[in-house]
């Protein structure tokens, strides 16, 4: 049941850009994971800001879970899943 308060809601920030095949794969992975884990997916186009382009331009896609980097480049579904599982276990303890 999805009933966490907003304070406990996990936020995945997904840094991406148009025309990025790795980003498309990563987004599919995140949407698949969202079926099993309750999180908000915040998608940010790095081209919306020179600062973001400079920071993440060579790394994208970049995935952060609650502000902590969980992966970049080729996003590993199992790594992200494990981090989400750890967070879920921590919230339920």
Region spans (language model):
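Non-catalytic, surface beta->alpha helical segment in thiol-disulfide oxidoreductase systems
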Residues: 68-91
């Amino acid at each position: 049941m999805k009933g966490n308060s907003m304070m406990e809601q996990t936020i995945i920030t997904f840094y991406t850009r148009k025309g990025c095949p790795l980003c498309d794969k990563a987004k599919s992975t995140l949407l698949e994971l969202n079926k099993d884990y309750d999180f908000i997916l915040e998608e940010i186009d790095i081209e919306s800001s020179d600062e973001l382009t400079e920071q993440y331009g060579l790394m994208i896609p970049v995935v952060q879970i609650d502000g902590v980097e969980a992966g970049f480049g080729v996003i590993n579904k199992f790594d992200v899943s494990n981090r989400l599982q750890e967070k879920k276990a921590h919230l339920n303890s």
